[in-house]
Amino acid sequence: MLNNNIVKRKNLSVIVLAFMVFVLAIVGFGCGTRTTVQLNNIPGTILNDGLAITNNTQWAWTNVQLTVNGSYNYSMEEINPQQTVNIVAKDFTHNGQSLDPSLLGAGTMLTGRCALPNNREGVFFIVWH
């Protein structure tokens, strides 16, 4: 009987510990640095921030999930994770021709230029999927 109570307590301890780890993982993930961006006034959230150094300049390569008429896998240069950026696409091109990204089929990649803070321009690409 005593051994049975010890086993039950150990099992309860393991369950409580697992639950605490689960809660901490959710809280930690939710509190991570996230940037709100807008592409042509469509809100999105930056995920999986990455950084590469090119020619002594920092370029932030970031994936954004946009959920308008489907979802975009969106990457762009020079986004500060601490700020909110309104990205206004100046043009979309595909095989050298401008087009509307809402008309794309799956797997189509767009590239384009966009306005960034401080009167800078950025380059982005979007893969529709």
Predicted regions and their residues:
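Short, hydrophobic/aromatic beta-strand segments
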Residues: 60-67
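Short, solvent-exposed loop/turn segments enriched in Ser/Thr/Gly
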Residues: 45-50, 103
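Asparagine-centered strand-capping/turn motif at beta-strand->loop junctions
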Residues: 51-58
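Bacterial N-terminal signal peptides that target proteins for export
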Residues: 4-18
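Terminal connector regions
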Residues: 92-129
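N-terminal Sec signal peptide cleavage junction
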Residues: 29-33
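Bacterial N-terminal signal peptides
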Residues: 17-27
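Intrinsically disordered, low-complexity Pro/Gly/Ser/Thr-rich segments with frequent PxxP/GP/PP motifs
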Residues: 70-102
